[in-house]
């Protein structure tokens, strides 16, 4: 009995071992099956997209590629509209380059390669469709390496983060997907099976291409959008605790302690300094290194760092609920809770105004604010009709005109030197004032202010020399400008209608082109930020008032009636709206904005330092010292207003 018991007990471990072996062997096919299902996932997703609204296509290579090419290459059909579709290359050529056969079923590898070719087509569509680039005479490797070396200054063995963002920018524009909420690049790479921090390589880039094409056909926005996805907030919270999927009870306790003790919102770059001064603020339970690392990683993802963005209540509702007017229920509040916790955790809304990362202006803000600005500019330019009040007093007209000329010189040169040029050179982006060190971050403003002081100093020397030394008995040739034309001659009858008409036409054409350039500059400024739009509008408005007053005087002196001159002046000012909407449409790219700002700064400097100073130095009047004071008052007022805007522009509410 004892022997049998020992024998039976000795068989138990052997039985368990054999069971383990058999279970392992039986598990292997299931694992292989799961991998097989994963490898065919992109093909299944693509078939589902291609069959949307139609009969499911048979898995036939030629027909599927043709359907895919039509949906990708024909925007009108892709958006559900009817119209002719002219493909820039044949589906058969696309299939052959990808290594597929006409009659066989479409394989996963071929789908991925075709997707990569379609990405290349989207990026180089203009060259391909204009016959400058022929896709049929190149091998697949050529297109693969072309995408990997999209940026010449980066490693051509991997598709870097910047190159991926470039491709996604092309696809967003090509497929015209909504940019309110976008799938982030890291999520897209993870969905494509890319785990390397360096990005996709030769083997994984086709998988990434297939995911991009499939999601884009589904209308999913990819890359950097105007608002983050709802998942971002939860990922931020988990990454701050060095967790990925689950939280332990101790980590939840750590999160609560952090929220309770971060009421003062100490930023990571101030922790070490404040530890010496305020030891009571930081408790032993807090670990700020996690927050620092997560902030650093996220800030490198793209041009906008969501970690330092203070979202409004309306923006949080738009992110999580996709609605703005409905009441927020308890279930809605549960969905929004990660966003609220993330805002408390990141302390974004407690940062100084000039350190908060601001969202780019929305389309409604850009078009709304800029339209109001140009409308005010048009109404301001009509102040030239105020000349009617000074028909009987030419001297008062000259004094008022010189006040506005000085104001125009101050605002134009101030906007160019204190705002536009620093923005083009990237000096605004470096502004991150440290507490108690305001003068260090604004150093370039004080240096440029010294430059303006030099301009003003030499103007004073020249003006005083003219007032004290030069005889005042003869006008210089420059005194024959429109601004000094006798008011009494404005209504004089025409002597030569043809010449007068030609002069009026020249004035109107010049005004129209000038207003068009002003509108272009305002459009680019409001595309950059509301602050830039305000400063540029103020500068242009101060310049337009004396400019239009002078032109209005010329129109009256050319023989036009008062009503006709007002109407012509108003019509020429409407070209500013044309320039505005062109500027808004072409300046979405920051690079285009910089070039428009560069040309605008040059135009402002020319007007303020070349065209207008002769009016200020050589104008004749019976009260020269009064004019001298008014000119300097206008200059100082213009420069002072732009200086205050340059210092406090970050505090202007959007």
Swiss-Prot record:
Task: Report keywords, A-Z.
Answer: Ion transport, Membrane, Transmembrane, Transmembrane helix, Transport, Zinc, Zinc transport
Transmembrane region positions?
208-228, 370-390, 399-419, 449-469, 502-522, 566-586, 590-610, 627-647
Ranges in the topological domain labelled Cytoplasmic: 229-369, 420-448, 523-565, 611-626
Q: Name one GO biological process term.
A: intracellular monoatomic cation homeostasis
Q: What Gene Ontology cellular-component terms does the record carry?
A: plasma membrane
Q: Where in the cell is it found?
A: Membrane
| Record's keyword annotation contains Nuclease | no
List GO molecular-function terms, semicolon-separated. Answer: monoatomic cation:bicarbonate symporter activity; zinc ion transmembrane transporter activity
- Give me the Extracellular side stretches, as residue ranges: 1-207, 391-398, 470-501, 587-589, 648-654
Its recorded reaction(s) are: Zn(2+)(in) = Zn(2+)(out)
Q: How does it sit in the membrane?
A: Multi-pass membrane protein
Q: Where can the motif XEXPHE-motif be found?
A: 543-548
What role is this protein assigned? Uniporter that promotes Zn(2+) import from the extracellular space to the cytoplasm across the cell membrane. The transport activity is temperature dependent. May play a role in neurulation and neurite extension. May play a key role in maintaining intracellular zinc content at levels that reduce the inhibitory effects of rises in oxidative stress on spermatogonia and spermatozoa viability during spermatogenesis.
Q: Which PANTHER family match?
A: SOLUTE CARRIER FAMILY 39, ZINC TRANSPORTER ZIP12
Which family would the database say this protein is a member of? Belongs to the ZIP transporter (TC 2.A.5) family.
Question: What protein name does the entry list?
Answer: Zinc transporter ZIP12
* UniProt source species: Macaca fascicularis
């Amino acid at each position: 009995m004892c022997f049998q018991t020992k024998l039976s007990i000795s068989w138990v471990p052997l039985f368990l071992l054999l069971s383990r072996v058999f279970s392992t062997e039986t598990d292997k096919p299931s694992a292989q099956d799961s991998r097989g299902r994963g490898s065919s996932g992109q093909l299944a997703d693509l078939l589902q997209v291609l069959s949307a609204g139609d009969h499911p296509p048979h898995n036939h290579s030629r027909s599927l590629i043709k359907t895919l090419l039509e949906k990708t290459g024909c925007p009108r059909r892709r958006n559900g509209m009817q119209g002719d579709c002219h493909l820039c290359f044949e589906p058969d050529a696309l299939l052959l380059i990808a290594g597929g056969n006409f009659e066989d079923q479409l394989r996963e590898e071929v789908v991925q390669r075709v997707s990569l070719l379609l990405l290349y087509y989207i990026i180089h569509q203009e060259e391909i469709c204009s016959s400058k680039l022929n896709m049929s005479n190149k091998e697949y490797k050529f297109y693969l390496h072309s995408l990997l070396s999209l940026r010449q200054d980066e490693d051509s063995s991997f598709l870097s983060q910047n190159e991926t963002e470039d491709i996604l920018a092309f696809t967003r524009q090509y497929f015209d997907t909504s940019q309110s909420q976008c799938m982030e690049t890291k999520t897209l790479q993870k969905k494509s099976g890319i785990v390397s921090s360096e990005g996709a390589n030769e083997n994984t880039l086709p998988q990434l291409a297939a995911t991009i094409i499939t999601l884009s056909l589904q209308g999913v926005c990819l890359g950097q959008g105007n608002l983050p996805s709802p998942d971002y907030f939860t990922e931020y919270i988990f990454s701050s605790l060095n967790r990925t999927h689950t939280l332990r009870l101790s980590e939840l306790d750590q999160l609560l302690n952090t929220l309770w003790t971060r009421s003062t919102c100490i930023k990571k770059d101030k922790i070490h300094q404040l530890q010496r001064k305020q030891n009571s603020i930081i408790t032993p339970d807090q670990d700020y290194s996690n927050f620092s690392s997560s902030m650093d990683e996220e800030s490198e993802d793209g041009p906008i760092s969501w970690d330092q963005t203070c979202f409004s209540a309306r923006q949080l509702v738009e992110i999580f609920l996709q609605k703005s007017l409905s009441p927020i229920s308890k279930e809605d509040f549960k969905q929004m809770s990660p966003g609220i916790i993330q805002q408390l955790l990141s302390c974004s809304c407690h940062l100084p105004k000039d350190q908060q990362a601001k969202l780019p202006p929305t389309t409604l803000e850009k078009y709304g604010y800029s339209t109001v600005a140009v409308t005010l500019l048009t109404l301001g330019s009509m102040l030239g009709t105020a000349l009617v009040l000074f028909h009987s007093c030419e001297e008062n007209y000259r004094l008022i005109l010189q006040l506005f000329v000085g104001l125009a010189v101050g605002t134009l040169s101030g906007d160019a030197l204190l705002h536009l040029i620093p923005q083009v050179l990237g000096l605004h982006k470096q502004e991150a004032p440290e507490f108690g060190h305001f003068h260090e971050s604004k150093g370039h403003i004080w240096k440029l202010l010294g430059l303006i002081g030099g301009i003003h100093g030499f103007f004073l020397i020249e003006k005083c020399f003219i007032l004290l030394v030069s005889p005042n008995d003869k006008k210089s040739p420059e005194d024959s400008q429109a601004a000094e034309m006798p008011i009494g001659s404005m209504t004089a009858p025409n002597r030569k209608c043809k010449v007068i008409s030609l002069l009026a036409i020249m004035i109107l054409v010049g005004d129209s082109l000038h207003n068009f350039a002003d509108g272009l500059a305002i459009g680019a400024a409001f595309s950059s930020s509301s602050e830039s739009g305000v400063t540029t509008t103020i500068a242009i408005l101060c310049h337009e008032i004396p400019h239009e007053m002078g032109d209005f005087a010329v129109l009256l002196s050319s023989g036009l009636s008062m009503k006709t001159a007002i109407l012509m002046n108003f019509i020429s000012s409407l070209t500013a709206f044309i320039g505005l909407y062109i500027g808004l449409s072409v300046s979405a790219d920051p690079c285009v904005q910089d070039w428009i700002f560069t040309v605008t700064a040059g135009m402002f400097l020319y007007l303020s330092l070349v065209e207008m100073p002769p009016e200020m130095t050589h104008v004749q009047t019976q009260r020269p010292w009064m004019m001298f004071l008014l000119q300097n008052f206008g200059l100082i007022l213009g420069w002072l207003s732009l200086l205050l805007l340059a210092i406090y522009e970050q505090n202007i509410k959007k």
